[in-house]
Curated annotation (Swiss-Prot):
Protein name: NADH-quinone oxidoreductase subunit K
This enzyme's EC code(s): 7.1.1.-
Gene: nuoK
PANTHER family with a match to the protein in the record: NADH-UBIQUINONE OXIDOREDUCTASE CHAIN 4L, NADH-UBIQUINONE OXIDOREDUCTASE SUBUNIT ND4L
Alphabetized InterPro entries for the sequence: NADH_UbQ_OxRdtase_chain4L/K, NUOK/Mnh_C1-like
Bilayer-spanning residue ranges: 6-26, 30-50, 64-84
Keyword Translocase part of the UniProt annotation: yes
GO biological process, one term: ATP synthesis coupled electron transport
Any one cellular-component term (Gene Ontology): plasma membrane
UniProt keyword list: Cell inner membrane, Cell membrane, Membrane, NAD, Quinone, Translocase, Transmembrane, Transmembrane helix, Transport, Ubiquinone
Provenance organism: Nitrosospira multiformis (strain ATCC 25196 / NCIMB 11849 / C 71)
GO MF annotation terms: NADH:ubiquinone reductase (non-electrogenic) activity; quinone binding
NCBIfam families xrefs: PRK05715.1-1, PRK05715.1-2
């Protein structure tokens, strides 16, 4: 089985990270913003795995496990906050967050 070259894996990670960043900057729906953050975290994890496999080290896979645990915590807290925002303001628009200021 032929290995995927390192620059191909890093290019894919960079493209995924850019798509996540564009999703954060363009979309106003908080669920899509949360999904874009998840895409960015997975892109960073992919970069770690690709770099670790290039140097035949397990460090990249260990870092990916840490990234997955951080992503799981981020999703649970983020969805709980989104649920509270939706109950209070009846919208998931990011501009509604500015109404929380006193």
């Amino acid at each position: 089985m032929a290995a995927i070259p390192m620059h191909h894996g890093l290019l894919l990670a960079a493209i995924l990270f850019a798509l996540g960043m564009i999703g954060i900057l363009v979309r106003r729906n908080l669920i899509f913003i949360l999904m874009s953050i998840e895409i960015m975290l997975n892109a960073a994890g992919l970069a770690f795995v690709v770099a670790g496999s290039h140097w035949t080290q397990a460090d990249g896979q260990v870092m990916f496990i840490f990234i997955l645990s951080v992503a799981a915590a981020e999703v649970s807290v983020g969805l709980a906050l989104l649920l509270l925002l939706h109950r209070r303001f009846q919208t998931l628009d990011a501009d509604a967050v500015s109404k929380m200021r006193g």
